[in-house]
């Protein structure tokens, strides 16, 4: 009986779902308020499903398709952060071009009839470099981030007002008839508030009042901030907000979930986190059953951390396990199963938003959440929390529910959806090589010069902090020194400690060893044998970062780089060079001359491949050219033959790669790196790779990316 009802109900939903609207389209929004049940847009309650898409993690050419697929998945709102360090890379100098064109992104959302939740922050975390804060903030005198600190509050308010004024000037707030129905100030402040003591509480109160004072005409939210001041709405982030969120801090605020994690971030050396479609659907349905009226999937499309935008140790692909993968392809059954959930819930929006809730116990681990109204009908959520299937009696009918599942009863009778029953077929992503770069004569090589102490312009008698010198303009800083050996040294070795992410140690121009940390190991310790000569010996150590941190209290106090250098001779006491004279060189020559651009290729002397010498060279720049693949589908570079570095295509960085950092299963965390079609020309594309460790460019391949199996959200009920 239940299966017949399920088939009938889903058929009906999928037929009428396209035409179902609660109270008008996004482009007609004139005002947004709220009460304890939901947001109210143009005087009508809204039950909203939202999906996070971050505009700089894809290209403007991708935005229309991503938004279209998101809308077709039953999503009403697109939620995005605003990226301060992209928009104000230098104090007072703003950039809203290309992937940074926030206005264009929002207007595209509006053109497709969806709403926007604009998370201004401007601290955002987001696994983004420095949590979105521009690095120049650290050099402002007296600066302490995210607390009751006047320098920080000044710059935070200035940027927040800049974004609000930009949105107003384009008429993009709902109060102006635009699509923006919500704005967010700050981000997950509960994680750090205790570290600032009473200044944390006063800061969050100030932040809320400052935001409200900007008069956007739409509500402000704070995620993971239980003490959000009125009228700011505090919201939940997590995987199980239906179980963990006690609700907003006022009965007059709606229950909202701003981050329902569809997967989880991934760092180098770790496997991807796989969250099932069934689990996401269960907790989303439970949140609605418990009076939730806004759910945002974080991420709905993750995209790519182009350039150096990822935070410490995070891979370049972002939330690839989302309903729309890194390339914007449907990930089934996650996409389709959630689409059916949205349709099922929206079919009963009226009783959900207008009806009275009743909670019934139907067994030791079974409940019913019933919403009923004489004028608006009835809907019930039957919840089975048991690890085994359960037969549930409800209103004189029997329903069989799978383990850990929620069934949705339209009209409190017809079982139209069950979270644990997936009707959408799984698809599989396929990579197809279209070109292997295995012709040696097609590659050219340029090797970085290893600097020596005498040639450096900055010298001190101490090991300086890495980012104080680089200002986050580059990942790299050379530490150079020299010492004289007057007596024989048996079994010589060098020992280094670093709070940076990577070190490459050269002694007398020979690589002695390399080491790196991880998200879990914060201090890099390296002991390596070396060859020394009588007389003067040169030490050159390349310190590397893999992104700045994205979270935590007192981020402005974090320090990185070398902290100890010692030379040992057999069993004798080590020679501590930490307080010797050190010289510094910021960045790489190839970076300084922008060797990845066509116009700068002749600024260095490239070598042709000779007898295989192009392989396994540390600190090497490689270049070649290639033609773009036919078609318009996604494209990626397979980099499994390389080690660690960065990739540019026609001058655009597609991100860092680190395929030598293996997971416990012995595989790279990421092997294929996305090249957006917008970066490509039909022919004559320039590929430049900087390799830190040593790899074989002859093993790199160009691939097209596609899916086989279910490419649309179709099921046996459609």
UniProtKB/Swiss-Prot annotation:
InterPro entries hit by this protein: BetaGal_gal-bd, Galactose-bd-like_sf, GHD, Gly_Hdrlase_35_cat, Glyco_hydro_35_CS, Glycoside_Hdrlase_35, Glycoside_hydrolase_SF
UniProt GO MF annotations: beta-galactosidase activity
GO CC aspect terms: apoplast; plastid
GO biological process, one term: carbohydrate metabolic process
Catalytic site: 188 (proton donor), 259 (nucleophile)
Tissue and organ distribution: Expressed at low levels in siliques.
Glycosylation sites per record: 291, 468, 538
Signal sequence coordinates: 1-28
Keyword check for Glycoprotein: yes
Enzymatic reactions: Hydrolysis of terminal non-reducing beta-D-galactose residues in beta-D-galactosides
Intracellular or extracellular location(s): Secreted, Extracellular space, Apoplast
Pfam families linked to this entry: BetaGal_gal-bd, GHD, Glyco_hydro_35
Enzyme Commission code: 3.2.1.23
PROSITE patterns: GLYCOSYL_HYDROL_F35
Keyword hit for Signal: yes
Keywords: Apoplast, Glycoprotein, Glycosidase, Hydrolase, Secreted, Signal
Membership in a protein family: Belongs to the glycosyl hydrolase 35 family.
The protein, known as: Beta-galactosidase 6
């Amino acid at each position: 009986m239940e299966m017949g009802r399920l088939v009938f109900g889903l058929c009906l939903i999928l037929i009428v779902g396209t035409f179902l609207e609660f109270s008008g389209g996004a482009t007609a929004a004139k005002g947004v308020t709220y009460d304890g049940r939901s947001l109210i847009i143009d005087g009508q309650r809204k039950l909203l499903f939202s999906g996070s898409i971050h505009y700089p993690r894809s290209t403007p050419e991708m935005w229309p398709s991503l938004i279209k697929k998101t809308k077709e998945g039953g999503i009403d709102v697109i939620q995005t952060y605003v990226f301060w360090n992209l928009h104000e890379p230098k104090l007072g100098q703003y950039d809203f071009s290309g992937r940074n064109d926030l206005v264009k992104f929002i207007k595209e959302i509006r053109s497709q009839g969806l709403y926007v939740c604009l998370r201004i922050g401007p601290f955002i975390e987001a696994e983004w470099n420095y949590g979105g804060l521009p690095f120049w903030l650290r050099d402002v005198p007296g600066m302490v981030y995210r607390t009751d600190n006047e320098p920080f509050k000044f710059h935070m308010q200035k940027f927040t007002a800049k974004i609000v004024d930009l949105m107003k000037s384009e008429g993009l707030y709902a109060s102006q008839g635009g699509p923006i129905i919500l704005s967010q100030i700050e981000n997950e402040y509960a994680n750090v508030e205790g570290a600032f003591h009473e200044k944390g509480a006063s800061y969050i109160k100030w932040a809320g009042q400052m935001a409200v004072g900007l008069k956007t005409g739409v509500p402000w939210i704070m995620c993971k901030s239980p003490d959000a001041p009125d009228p700011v709405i505090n919201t939940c982030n997590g995987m199980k907000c239906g179980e963990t969120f006690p609700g907003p801090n006022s009965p007059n605020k709606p229950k909202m979930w701003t981050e329902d994690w569809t997967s989880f971030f991934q760092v180098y050396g770790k496997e991807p986190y796989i969250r099932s479609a069934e689990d996401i659907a269960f907790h989303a349905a439970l949140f609605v059953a418990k009076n939730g009226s806004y759910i945002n999937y974080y991420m709905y499309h993750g995209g790519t951390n182009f350039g150096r935008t990822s935070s410490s140790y995070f891979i370049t692909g972002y939330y690839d396990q989302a309903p729309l993968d890194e390339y914007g392809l449907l990930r089934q059954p996650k996409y389709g199963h959630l689409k059916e959930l949205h349709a099922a819930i929206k079919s009963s929006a009226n009783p959900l938003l207008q009806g009275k809730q009743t909670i019934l116990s139907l067994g030791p681990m079974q409940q019913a959440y019933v919403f009923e109204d004489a004028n608006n009908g009835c809907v019930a959520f039957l919840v089975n929390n048991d690890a085994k299937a359960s037969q549930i009696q409800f209103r004189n009918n029997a329903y069989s529910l799978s383990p850990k599942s929620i069934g949705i009863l339209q009209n409190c009778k017809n079982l139209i959806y069950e979270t644990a029953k997936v009707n959408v077929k799984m698809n599989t992503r396929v990579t197809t090589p279209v070109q292997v770069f295995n012709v040696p004569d097609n590659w050219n090589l340029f090797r970085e010069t290893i600097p020596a102490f005498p040639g450096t312009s900055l010298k001190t008698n101490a090991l300086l902090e890495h980012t104080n010198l680089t200002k986050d303009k580059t990942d790299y800083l050379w530490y150079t020194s020299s010492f004289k050996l007057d007596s024989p040294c048996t079994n010589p070795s060098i020992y280094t400690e670093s709070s940076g992410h990577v070190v490459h140690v050269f002694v007398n121009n020979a690589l002695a060893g390399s080491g790196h940390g991880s998200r879990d190991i914060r201090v890099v310790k390296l002991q390596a044998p070396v060859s020394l000569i009588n007389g003067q010996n040169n030490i050159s150590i390349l310190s590397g970062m893999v992104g700045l941190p994205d979270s935590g209290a007192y981020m402005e106090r974090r320090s990185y780089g070398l902290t100890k250098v010692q030379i040992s001779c057999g069993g004798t006491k080590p020679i501590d060079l930490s307080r010797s004279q050190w010289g510094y060189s910021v960045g790489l020559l190839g970076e300084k001359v922008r060797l990845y651009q066509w116009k700068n290729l002749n600024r260095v002397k490239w070598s042709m491949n000779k007898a295989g010498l192009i392989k396994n060279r540390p600190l090497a720049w490689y270049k070649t050219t290639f033609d773009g693949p036919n078609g318009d589908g996604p494209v990626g570079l397979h980099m499994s033959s390389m080690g660690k570095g960065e990739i540019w295509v026609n001058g655009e960085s597609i991100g860092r790669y680190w395929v030598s950092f293996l997971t416990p299963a012995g595989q790279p965390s990421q092997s294929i790196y996305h090249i957006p079609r917008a970066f490509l020309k039909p022919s004559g594309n320039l590929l430049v790779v900087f390799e830190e460790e040593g790899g074989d460019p002859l093993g790199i391949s160009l691939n097209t990316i596609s899916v086989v199996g279910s490419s649309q959200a179709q099921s046996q009920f459609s």
